[in-house]
Amino acid sequence: MKIQLIAVGTKMPVWVKNGFEEYQRRFPKDMPFELIEIAAGKLGKNADIKRILEQEGKAMLAAAGKAKIVSLDIPGKPWTTEQLATQLESWKSDGRDICLLIGGPEGLSTECKQAAEQSWSLSPLTLPHPLVRVIVAESLYRAWSLTTNHPYHRE
């Protein structure tokens, strides 16, 4: 199983890139974890937000292909580390690749939300989308460590 994090935004601060890559490199070879960045629409004073969201959404769904889509969205289901570990095992046994979608400053398009087979809420708080990349990478690595009895996760 391959895990893809499809995120809107291509020019992230160095700390985001470094934080994501720190966890990405820790994943085992049999569970590659990759980042696909989608260019963000141009937001300005007269920007057509609906059109921008639609364009970003189409690009995200095209990148996802036939993989199982999991959206990251506030109204989604919150998972504990243990529940995420169970999800990870379930996804592995399903045999499909997984695509996790992170929207940009305006969120996810309606099409992305509808295409998602699951929706995951990291927090009821609105989080900056660059930070979400790092949180998701760490959370997935922690969940993997729990499933393999790796000492990273401590209770």
From Swiss-Prot:
Similarity field? Belongs to the RNA methyltransferase RlmH family.
Give yes or no: UniProt keyword Methyltransferase. yes
Q: Where in the cell is it found?
A: Cytoplasm
Q: Which domain of life is it from?
A: Bacteria
Kindly list the positions annotated as binding S-adenosyl-L-methionine. L72, G103, L122, S123, P124, L125, T126, L127
Q: Does the keyword Signal apply?
A: no
Which enzyme class? transferase
Output the Gene Ontology terms for molecular function: rRNA (pseudouridine-N3-)-methyltransferase activity
Name of the protein this chain belongs to: Ribosomal RNA large subunit methyltransferase H
S-S bridge residues? none
Q: Provide the function of this protein.
A: Specifically methylates the pseudouridine at position 1915 (m3Psi1915) in 23S rRNA.
Q: Which Gene3D superfamilies match?
A: 3.40.1280.10
